Design a protein with these regions (language model features):
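Mature-chain termini and adjacent capping regions
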Residues: 1-154
Length: 154
């Protein structure tokens, strides 16, 4: 049976929205300030939704999240800077204080409205600065796919 968990103190990615986490299993260690969710994990915050096999959250002393790490078939639908994205990777890390995402191993990021696609071994995205960085593993190159509208000559 799936365990529905709404974490009371688990608010803000800077915007004071409630985070809801659904998983098969939940583990917390208050001394280490860590929570671990395993099995069919779904994290929802506003319109953003993350699914993965496992999500680990590290908290500060005020019980605010410092870092989210999603592993195992991690997929995310999110809005960043008024753009809608889908991302997938073996591991995803989100730093809410810096508004930074890191997608690691078989990383893919798709901007839905403009149909831009980025593939790489590691994708770094900063919401605050609008900076994107993509790295390869040396075996496969980074790939960026986008459409160009050709203007017709009269």
């Amino acid at each position: 049976m799936r365990l529905l968990l709404v974490i009371f103190g688990l608010v803000t990615f800077l915007s004071a929205q409630t985070v809801e986490i659904v998983a098969d299993k939940f583990y917390a260690d208050e001394k280490k300030q860590i929570s671990e969710f395993t099995g069919h994990v779904t994290v929802t915050k506003g319109k953003d939704k993350l699914v993965a096999d496992k999500v680990v959250i590290i908290f500060d002393k005020k019980r605010q999240p410092l870092k989210y790490t999603a592993t195992g078939n991690a997929k995310i639908d999110m809005t960043m800077n008024d753009k809608v994205y889908f991302g997938s990777a073996q591991t995803m890390i989100y730093n809410p204080l810096k508004d930074q995402y890191i997608l690691i191993k078989n990383a893919f990021l798709y901007e839905k409205i403009t149909d831009k696609k980025v593939y790489g071994e590691k994708i770094f995205v900063s919401q605050k600065t609008g900076r994107y960085e993509v790295e390869s593993d040396g075996k496969k190159p980074v790939k960026f796919i986008f459409k160009v509208e050709e203007k017709k000559k009269k």
